[in-house]
């Protein structure tokens, strides 16, 4: 016969396990944190240029459109000058409503010019679905940069925006820098892309992919972060004299997060 003490211990362990899973699944994945950083990019005294950066939306049965819409609404409230999307827009684990997804994304381009790159979840599932992602972004007014560059011009400033292909697909092949010698911002899904671009001129790289580790285990860290260089799992970090910013992302795999809230990022470039 089980003792009262062991029964209470087993009951407490069951409750703790259930509560922990409930928190990871029902609480933290929808608890967005608005992150702000001011970065010396132009190195002038003009007003800050505001960029909204979102990545890893991961529309799926685990990440509903309502959650993605909430993240977008929070970002738009900050009145950005430019919006950048860092890849991994879906998980192809179910039939997805791409028309509804386009409707959710449309407010971004209505707010500010919006550019995107692709991530590893956007490319390995066949040409038809890759085509659907590209068409969905396009129908929402979003421009995809696939190893392409464009010049972003404001009344007082210019900089070159580069979007790369996915590193894991062997498609990270950025174009040469322009001859104008402008500040260069790179949009690359995976922060390990820095190694491919080590000898290329750039000043700031914006990445996703890691989800910040998604499950941050006390005393262990981020054992599940899918990158070679763990220094760039999350946040703003130096790479020599350059900087890499890795967002924790909006969505998640399997709808779980622990000590790693989803993120809406506002960057002010000065």
From Swiss-Prot:
Positions of a divalent metal cation 2 binding: 88, 120, 209
Amino acids binding a divalent metal cation 1: 56, 58, 88, 211
UniProt-recorded Gene Ontology molecular function terms: metal ion binding; phosphoric diester hydrolase activity; UDP-2,3-diacylglucosamine hydrolase activity
A single Gene Ontology CC term: membrane
EC number, as in UniProt: 3.1.4.-
Organism superkingdom: Bacteria
Keywords associated with the record: Hydrolase, Metal-binding
Cofactor: a divalent metal cation
Family: Belongs to the metallophosphoesterase superfamily.
Function description: Shows phosphodiesterase activity, hydrolyzing phosphodiester bond in the artificial chromogenic substrate bis-p-nitrophenyl phosphate (bis-pNPP).
Protein name per the record: Phosphodiesterase YaeI
């Amino acid at each position: 016969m089980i003792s009262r003490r062991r029964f209470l211990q087993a009951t407490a362990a069951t409750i703790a396990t259930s509560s922990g899973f409930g928190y990871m699944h029902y609480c933290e994945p929808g608890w967005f944190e608005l992150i702000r950083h001011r970065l010396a990019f132009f190195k002038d005294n003009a007003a800050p240029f505001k960029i909204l950066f979102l990545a890893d939306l991961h529309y799926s049965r685990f990440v509903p459109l309502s959650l993605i819409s909430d993240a977008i609404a929070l970002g738009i409230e900050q009145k950005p000058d430019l919006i950048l999307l860092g890849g991994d827009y879906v998980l192809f684990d179910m039939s997805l409503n791409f028309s509804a997804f386009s409707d959710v994304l449309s407010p971004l381009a209505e707010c500010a010019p919006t550019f995107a790159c692709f991530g590893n979840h956007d490319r390995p599932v066949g040409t038809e679905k890759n085509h659907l992602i590209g068409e969905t972004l396009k129908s929402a007014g979003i421009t995809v940069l696939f190893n392409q560059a464009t010049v972003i011009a404001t009344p007082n400033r210019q900089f070159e925006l580069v979007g790369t292909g996915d590193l894991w697909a062997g498609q990270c092949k950025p174009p040469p820098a322009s001859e104008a010698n402008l500040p260069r911002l790179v949009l690359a899904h995976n922060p390990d892309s820095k190694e491919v671009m080590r000898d290329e001129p750039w000043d700031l790289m914006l990445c996703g992919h890691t989800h910040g580790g998604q499950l941050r285990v006390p005393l262990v860290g981020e054992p599940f972060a899918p990158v070679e260089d763990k220094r760039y799992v999350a946040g703003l970090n130096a790479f020599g004299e350059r900087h890499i910013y890795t967002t924790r992302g909006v969505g998640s795999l399997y709808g779980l997060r622990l000590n790693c809230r989803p993120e809406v990022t506002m960057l002010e470039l000065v």
